[in-house]
């Protein structure tokens, strides 16, 4: 009702504060879709306040992620997901949540690697120059589950056992 009242007034800006929080999951998905469609059709600047990262990621062109009243990072949803500027941002954005490993930057066979307990991970080429300054130091390595792929035994860098699979219809967690 409140959104309908705002629409008929032809505002220049919408401020929507925790609008979908009280809706069940199915209705929230439907209303989120409709709100995005209406906002796009009207071309009205919309400031949407939410604690739900799914709402933020799916509805926003630009996100300002805040913690305790301070801006932690701002940018497009993809910027925050792919290039978080802090552990807080990396942990907040993405489902399932990013995996964090405490590792030491070491040199093995002339290349840099992350030593995470018994696990040894190659430092990606695009991070080698940056990681030089951390050689011998501990860092936190973030691994997004969506970026991991299965490889035949003996060909991957990480060996493990799948403990649980959550089917989502078109994918799995």
Question: In which residue ranges do the predicted regions lie?
Answer:
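Short, P/G- and charge-enriched loop/turn segments at secondary-structure junctions
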Residues: 4, 90, 127-130
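ABC ATPase nucleotide-binding domains
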Residues: 1-88
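Non-catalytic connector elements of ABC transporters
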Residues: 96-100, 107-173
């Amino acid at each position: 009702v409140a959104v309908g009242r705002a629409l008929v007034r032809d505002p220049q800006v919408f401020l929507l504060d925790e609008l979908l929080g009280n809706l069940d999951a199915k209705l929230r998905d439907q209303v989120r879709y409709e709100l995005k469609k209406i906002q796009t059709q009207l071309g009205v600047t919309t400031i949407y306040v939410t604690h739900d990262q799914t709402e933020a990621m799916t509805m926003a062109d630009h996100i300002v992620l805040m913690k305790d009243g301070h801006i932690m990072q701002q940018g497009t949803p993809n910027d925050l997901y792919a290039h978080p500027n802090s552990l807080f941002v990396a942990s907040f954005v993405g489902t399932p949540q990013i995996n964090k490993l405490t590792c030491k930057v070491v040199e093995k066979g002339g290349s840099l690697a992350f030593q995470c307990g018994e696990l040894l991970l190659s430092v990606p080429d695009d991070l080698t120059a940056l990681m030089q300054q951390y050689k011998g130091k501990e860092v936190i390595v973030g691994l997004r589950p969506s970026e991991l792929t299965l490889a035949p035994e003996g060909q991957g860098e990480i060996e493990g056992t799948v403990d649980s699979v959550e089917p989502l219809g078109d994918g799995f967690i």
